[in-house]
């Protein structure tokens, strides 16, 4: 699966996603829609910093709730995805969809 195909699949299965960025193992953007760009990966870095303060390993996923949107970040098989969704998006489904997209990308490599 190409990164562009992964984005298309995500947008097809979830009408609640507004923006998505997919990242390779080095942290480079491989595909994005909605203008998230490389800075979006910082959400995982911030979550890792918080985990480290608590003596925990790096996070696999995180969610940030804002009044007007939810932000989701996921790591899977060395890849990462960050998405902005409507505030009423179902977190479990968004995490599942992002993880499946990353698995598809990892399997194609």
Report the location of each language-model feature:
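Non-catalytic interaction/Regulatory regions outside core domains
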Residues: 1-25, 29-109
